[in-house]
């Protein structure tokens, strides 16, 4: 077995998926899930950042917009991949509509479904976090006019009040949405894998050997988390609109202005997130605190098995797929121990045979259950 040495320090992050963790290294993405039989299935895909293809996409502000779009697309695709990797027991019987789509679209159905899912996610996000707050802002402006009726002019504080109320509304909606998601058992379990991802990242950042025991003591709250990013977006948005368009009262012009400036808000927020994450002083610790507290809603304490999954993803993202590992028909590696993902680990023929035999037994059991 290879010595369990720490990973080289590189910029690596990830996300929780169904019963697993995705880790993104500078040049690859690894997804690991734990199947009901206890085995871990892992895949690795080569990854080239957009900034390497087009230099201008790595410029400040612009890179934040690119990163947001990339993570949305990547998040959807990794969730789909994790469901496939979990096996048939997690796949629902396709509906008549899905069967009809499959006949019409053939191999392109996955791309179409993914595109529709992304569009729906964007529409929901825009509706919840932009249209609804804009409506509250319009209502607030109307109420101010109602209670100051008879005044020669609108009060000077009206624009500021409307903008602050809109910003607070966004934060309240975000908190309520995340709290509601955490009440769903499957999502709550995914939040535990989210915590495992953060602990593994901390372990790597502190140059410790990647083991569940070393990762466990770390907090589940990480300054570079997407939850913190969303909170920063809300705050930057509120600050920006204190100066831009605060006197626009009608719903549609105000909503469209917020929508048009969303890329600017996202780009600035990304730079703020990176700055706060990579600096450690009294000011940055205070500024990071609200975003870290928001993560108490989206991360939960993982168990040791979840930490093992996160560590496998990190090892594979950094070092590549385990050599000579037993593979599924799809080319995914099957592991029974997180140490099998360490760089330089060599599977024995006996190990491979035992893992494949176990997989065959589980498949036979599933077939018998289907026959019953």
What are these regions (language model features)?
Residues 56-81, 165-191, 262-278:
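Hydrophobic alpha-helical membrane-embedded segments
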Residues 2-17, 21-23, 160, 164-229, ...:
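Polar-ligand-bearing catalytic/cofactor-coordination segments
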Residues 109-127, 218-244:
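Transmembrane alpha-helical segments and their cytosolic interface motifs
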Residues 52-55, 68, 75-94, 98, ...:
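Multi-pass alpha-helical transmembrane bundle typical of ion/small-solute transporters
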Residues 89-148, 158-183:
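Hydrophobic alpha-helical segments characteristic of transmembrane helices
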Residues 1-87, 94:
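Divalent-cation
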Residues 81, 85, 122-151, 233-266, ...:
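Juxtamembrane "helix exit" motif at the C-terminal ends of alpha-helical transmembrane segments
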Residues 3-11, 16-17, 51-58, 98-114, ...:
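Cytosolic juxtamembrane amphipathic/interface segments immediately preceding
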């Amino acid at each position: 077995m290879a010595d369990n040495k720490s990973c080289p320090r590189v910029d690596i992050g990830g996300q929780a998926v169904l019963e697993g963790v995705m880790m993104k290294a500078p040049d690859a993405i690894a997804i690991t899930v734990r199947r009901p039989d206890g085995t871990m299935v892992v895949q690795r895909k080569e990854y080239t950042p957009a900034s390497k293809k087009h230099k201008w996409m790595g410029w400040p502000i612009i890179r934040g917009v690119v990163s947001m779009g990339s993570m949305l697309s990547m998040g959807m695709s990794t969730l789909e991949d994790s469901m496939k990797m979990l096996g048939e027991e997690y796949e629902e019987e396709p509906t008549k509509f899905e069967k009809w789509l499959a006949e019409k679209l053939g191999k392109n159905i996955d791309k179409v479904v993914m595109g529709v899912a992304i569009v729906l996610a964007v529409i929901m996000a825009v509706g919840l976090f932009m249209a609804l707050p804009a409506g509250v802002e319009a209502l607030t402006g109307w109420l101010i006019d109602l209670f100051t009726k008879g005044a020669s002019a609108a009060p000077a504080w009206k624009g500021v009040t409307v903008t602050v109320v809109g910003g607070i509304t966004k934060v309240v909606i975000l908190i309520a949405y995340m709290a509601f998601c955490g009440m769903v058992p499957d999502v709550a379990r995914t939040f535990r894998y989210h915590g495992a991802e953060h602990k593994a990242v901390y372990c790597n950042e502190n140059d410790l050997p990647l083991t569940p025991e070393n990762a466990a003591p770390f907090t589940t709250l990480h300054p570079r988390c997407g939850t913190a990013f969303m909170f920063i977006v809300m705050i930057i948005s509120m600050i920006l609109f204190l100066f831009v368009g605060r006197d626009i009262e009608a719903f549609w012009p105000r909503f469209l202005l917020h929508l048009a400036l969303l890329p600017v808000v996202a780009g600035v927020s990304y730079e703020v997130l990176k700055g706060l994450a990579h600096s450690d002083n009294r000011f940055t610790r205070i500024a990071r605190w609200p975003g870290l507290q928001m993560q108490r809603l989206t991360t939960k304490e993982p168990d040791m098995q979840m930490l093992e999954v996160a560590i496998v993803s990190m090892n594979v993202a950094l070092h590549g797929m385990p050599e000579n590992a037993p593979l599924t028909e799809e080319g995914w590696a099957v592991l029974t121990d997180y140490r099998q993902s360490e760089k330089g680990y060599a599977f024995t023929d006996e190990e491979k045979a035992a893992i494949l035999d176990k997989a065959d037994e589980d498949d036979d059991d599933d077939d018998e259950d289907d026959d019953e």
